[in-house]
Each structure stands twice: as structure tokens, then as C-alpha cells.
């Protein structure tokens, strides 16, 4: 696949994201407008829950209503209070989110508690399922660090009903890496759930070349046909400009950011 082809595919798999603490209505509207490119639209935009209605209105105004709206809960710290995570998830759905990215209680898992993570995901999944909302579970691979913990968090999230497993919040020192992606993709393969569980690489994927490496990895482990927006996403913001530069034959400017 040519770099241009990869860029076009990657664009269609993006969850175009703004999760900065200084986010405003204007910035969310601008994000939605950025995603309306001559090469197509991203799979979703990802914003804080309170901005979901703003994004909905902006997407409708530019006639790109096919773009899903994702949001985050139990974010970014992945606390182990199940009630709070469920309450936040219910609120996100009430705001009108199509997809919820919930943070797995990874610190509890690191301390040896597997049950709370399973139960938290299970209860959030029940709430999402009742409303036809997709649940992505952020396991925070850069904090889990070890292959054993990354695999265990992936397994627990999947067994509890995750529709996607996602690498990172983008709020810690180490976000998506090819190593952690490989473990997560292999877990999806090994549990025989590729038809119903997807993968999202978030934070740290900034260039077309980097995106292409993740696409190639997913295809190697789960097959060419698996890589589509129902199964694979990139959580990113600065990646978009680099994909567009590739598609427009311009020299990419690496932009800092998620």
C-alpha cells in the first residue's frame, strides 16, 4: 500500500480528539470543521462530555453527521470507584455520545486487584449496551508497562464486554507504542474475539509513517479485512495535519500534541 493510500485509510480511522483542559465550544467547533476534509472525514471526534452537544450541532451544520461523537469517562486517572465511573458514563450518554472511552482502573490492577476492573467495565458496558453506545476501554499501557499486565488488562476488559481496547489516555508520559499494540492485538486474536472487539491506538501517533506501522501490525496479526472503523481507530489530533500533508504532497510539519 502506498503512503498516500495509508494516509487516506488512517484519516478514515481517526477519532479526531481534543481533550485539553482549556477546551472551549469554539475549539470543539473548529475540530469538527478540521475533520471535514477533501479526502473524507474521520470515524469520530472525541471531546469531553459537556461538549458532545456542541459537536453534534457543528457536525450537523456542515452535513457530516456520519461522524460519530466519542467522549471519555473515569478520565484520566482510572480511579476504582465503580459508581462514579457508571454515573459519568450515564451522563455521557445523556449528553448524546455515540461512543464512550472509559479508563480502566489500572492502578488497582497494578496493586493486584483484578476484580474491580472487570466489574467497572461490566457495569459501564451494561449502561452503554442499553443505549446502543459503543464502549472503548483505555488500559493505560504506558503505566502498566509490563507485557503481563498489558495482556491481563486487555483480557479483563474484553471478558467484561469491551467493544474496543484502547492503549492510552494521552495524559501520561508514555502513550501508544507498537510493543503495547502488538500485545493488545494478539490478545484479541488469542481470545478469538476479533469479530466483536476492536483496538484503538491513542496518543503518540503523529506521522503518516507511524500510522502506517500500526496499520501493518494490525493486518499482520488480524488480517487485511479486519482493519476498518468498526475494529480499528487512532486517537489523535496532530496526526490529521500530517495525513493531509501526505495526501497533498506537501512536506509534513510535525505538530506537537496528542
UniProtKB/Swiss-Prot annotation:
Main location: cytoplasm
EC id: 4.1.2.4
Pfam families linked: DeoC (PF01791)
Name of the protein described by the UniProt record: Deoxyribose-phosphate aldolase
Organism: Haemophilus ducreyi (strain 35000HP / ATCC 700724)
Role of this protein: Catalyzes a reversible aldol reaction between acetaldehyde and D-glyceraldehyde 3-phosphate to generate 2-deoxy-D-ribose 5-phosphate.
Localization terms from the record: Cytoplasm
GO biological process, one term: deoxyribonucleotide catabolic process
Family the UniProt entry places it in: Belongs to the DeoC/FbaB aldolase family. DeoC type 2 subfamily.
GO molecular function: deoxyribose-phosphate aldolase activity
UniProt pathway: Carbohydrate degradation; 2-deoxy-D-ribose 1-phosphate degradation; D-glyceraldehyde 3-phosphate and acetaldehyde from 2-deoxy-alpha-D-ribose 1-phosphate: step 2/2
Keyword flag Lyase: yes
HAMAP family documented for this protein: DeoC_type2
NCBIfam families recorded: deoC
Annotated active site: 101 (proton donor/acceptor), 166 (schiff-base intermediate with acetaldehyde), 200 (proton donor/acceptor)
Species lineage: Bacteria, Pseudomonadati, Pseudomonadota, Gammaproteobacteria, Pasteurellales
Record gene name: deoC
